[in-house]
Structures are given as C-alpha cells and as structure tokens.
C-alpha cells in the first residue's frame, strides 16, 4: 500500500470509530477552501460551514456573523443548519453580541445556564463563538451550536481560532 492509501484508510477508520474527523486533518481542507479564488467569499464561507458541520458530529449549526457596516449589530452570513430568525443581532445581545463587544472567545457548555442567551432552537445545548480579527479589528465571528451538552474542548477553541485566522485573509 502506498502512503497516501494508508493515510486514507487510517482516516476513514478513525472517522468510523470516533464519528469525527481530527482537527489536524481538517486544517488543510480549510486552507484549500480559503485559497480557492474561483469561488466568491460567501461560497468559501459556506464551504467551510459545510466542512465543519459534516465532519464534526457535535457541530449541529455552523455559521458566520459579520459587523453590519458601521452599525452596532451583527448580520448573519453563510451558515448550515436549521433556519434561524436571528439574522440581525445587536451588539451585547446573546452570545454573539457579547463576543462583538468583548473581543473574546465565548464557550457556553450549557445554554440554559446563560442569562443573556438568544435561543435559536430548543435542541441547542451548547454554543461556542470565536471572533474574527482583521488588522486588530473584530469584523465578525464563527458561531457553532451543538445539540450535545458540554461538547466543546480547548482543542475546539484552538481549531476554530485557526479557522478564523484563515477566514480573516478573505477580507
């Protein structure tokens, strides 16, 4: 067996056993999507959402929010998952709105324990939001909802920070 075939076999076996693709194997795919200039920025963002939602079993809703011009609000960008009514989120409201103000990652292991949480679905149990910075300015964020209680680890945070740094190069 050639090295490439062995790697493919190992990766497929890992995914079958654990139900998720390791973050390190997703990084080159994220980079490849970002570098694909044949697609629009929104198409690339959607492809990243699809990649994450497909390969990480506890990522049940994956989307991007971006600052809406000069307004103190976020506007929903590309996403995959259940439709949401939250297409505009004022700064400070909900987890996403808080990240727009704090410029910090926000990991919520149990959304029912959060006072300032905007419910998108009764199925959502946890959320993670990571800001996207361009030249030191918070321009948006990636938002992940999970139907699994407390699924996010430090590895998720580091991986999503990587994704956000790659996405930042599109702007």
Where are these regions (language model features)?
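Low-complexity, intrinsically disordered or signal/transmembrane-proximal segments
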Residues: 2-5
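Short hydrophobic/aromatic beta-strand element in the GNAT-like acyltransferase core
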Residues: 61, 129, 141
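A short, aliphatic-rich beta-strand micro-motif
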Residues: 126-133
């Amino acid at each position: 067996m050639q090295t490439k075939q062995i790697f493919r076999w190992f990766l497929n076996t890992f995914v079958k056993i654990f139900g998720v693709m390791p973050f390190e194997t997703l990084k080159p795919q994220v980079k490849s999507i970002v570098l694909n200039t044949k697609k629009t920025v929104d198409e690339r963002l959607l492809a990243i959402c699809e990649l994450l939602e497909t390969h990480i079993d506890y990522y049940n809703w994956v989307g991007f929010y971006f600052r809406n011009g000069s307004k103190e609000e976020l506007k929903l960008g590309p996403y995959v998952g259940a439709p949401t009514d939250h297409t505009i989120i004022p700064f400070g409201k909900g987890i996403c709105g808080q990240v727009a103000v704090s410029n910090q990652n926000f990991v919520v292991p149990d959304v029912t324990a959060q006072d300032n949480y905007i419910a998108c679905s009764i199925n959502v149990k946890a959320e993670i939001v990571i800001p996207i910075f361009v030249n030191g300015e918070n321009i948006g964020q990636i938002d992940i909802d999970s139907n699994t209680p407390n699924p996010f680890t430090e590895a998720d945070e580091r991986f999503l920070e990587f994704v956000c740094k790659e996405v930042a190069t599109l702007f």
